[in-house]
Amino acid sequence: MNVILLGAPGAGKGTQATKLVEKYEIPHISTGDIFRSNIKGQTPIGVDAKSYIDKGQLVPDEVTVEIVKNRLNEDDCQKAGYLLDGFPRNIFQAEELDKFSNVEKVVNISVDLSKLLKRITGRRVCSKCGESYHVDFLNGKTDCARCGGELIQRADDNEETVGKRLAVYTEQTQPLIDYYEKAGKLITVNGDQSIDEVFAEICEKLG
């Protein structure tokens, strides 16, 4: 099974990816992980990618496509398929992906953006152990139930930054949603449900 997972920051994509790769026994292909392993292994394409990252520049589409292509050509993906996360990010990447891999389904976890904003800006993390909480369930507590550490809001979880991230995501992703909808591959799932309900809906629609 060859599946792409789409979802805005805070939509629970990572949680669903973990559950899906367990159920369907397919490798979870995250572009961030592939970049890190290529850079760490100092592969020619990893060295190329690092040269852009070190300058604070975006890695060109052609380099990203090549890194993903190499990973999808490995034995585990050839045998079992994949769950692709973080790629494609634009139409060029989607069209290139279609040239070397048959994408079967594209799962879009759709979440009400105002609820998403509340979910992310209300997030608090323990400064010591990293445990995550939400202000709605803290009842005014300011310390971690696990280790007693101070609960803080991440610098990039403020309303202005989150709002910008969501706007960029929507602008980038809507053309992809349209692209895969036209191809008859799009599955839209209601991400405002509980984790288990979202998972059940994805599995039902994947068949």
Give residue ranges: language-model regions:
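Hydrophobic anchor at the beta1->P-loop junction of P-loop NTPases
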Residues: 5
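P-loop (Walker A) phosphate-binding loop of NTP-binding proteins
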Residues: 8
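Conserved lysine of the Walker
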Residues: 13
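ATP-dependent small-molecule kinase phosphotransfer cores
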Residues: 27-102, 125, 154, 199
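ATP-dependent NMP and nucleoside kinases share a basic, alpha-helical "lid"
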Residues: 84-132, 136
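Cys/His-rich short segments
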Residues: 118-163
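NTP-dependent small-molecule kinase module
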Residues: 150-207
